[in-house]
Amino acid sequence: MTWQAYIDTNLIGSGFISAQILSSADGSSWANSNGFSVSATEAQHILSCFKDSNKASAMGITINNVKNFVLKADDKSIYAKKDAGGVVLVKTNQTILVAVYNSNLQPGAAANACEALGDYLREQGF
């Protein structure tokens, strides 16, 4: 399966409004949903937040110029919220999944879908 297929099938198909797969090494984009792109600055901030989860909690996570309040952050996942929507970030060995949801998708369902893809990618060595 291509990286784009993971986005289209597992994330967008699960109800996310936007998604992107970044390299966990340098933050470069491997695939993204149509019209969605995490900026280089945002990607670097995400990488640094996975290295220091306290930074995520203190500074929040900005995706597409929207600052989200961090609810949970550790070395494998970051959950953040803005109004009725939010973002789930999941880090694997080689990737960072970025999945943005709105009020049509419950936060728990968003986390489960993104974490499930992250678990699958880890099992596959990614």
From Swiss-Prot:
Keyword Electron transport: no
GO molecular function annotations of the record: actin binding; actin monomer binding; phosphatidylinositol-4,5-bisphosphate binding
Principal cellular location given in the protein's record: cytoplasm
GO biological process, one term: chemotaxis to cAMP
Keywords on record: Actin-binding, Cytoplasm, Cytoskeleton
Any single Gene Ontology cellular-component annotation: cell cortex
Compartments in which it is found: Cytoplasm, Cytoskeleton
Role this protein plays: Binds to actin and affects the structure of the cytoskeleton. At high concentrations, profilin prevents the polymerization of actin, whereas it enhances it at low concentrations. By binding to PIP2, it inhibits the formation of IP3 and DG.
Entry similarity comment: Belongs to the profilin family.
Subunit relationships: Occurs in many kinds of cells as a complex with monomeric actin in a 1:1 ratio.
The protein's name: Profilin-3
Organism, as annotated: Dictyostelium discoideum (Social amoeba)
Organism placement in taxonomy: Eukaryota, Amoebozoa, Evosea, Eumycetozoa, Dictyostelia
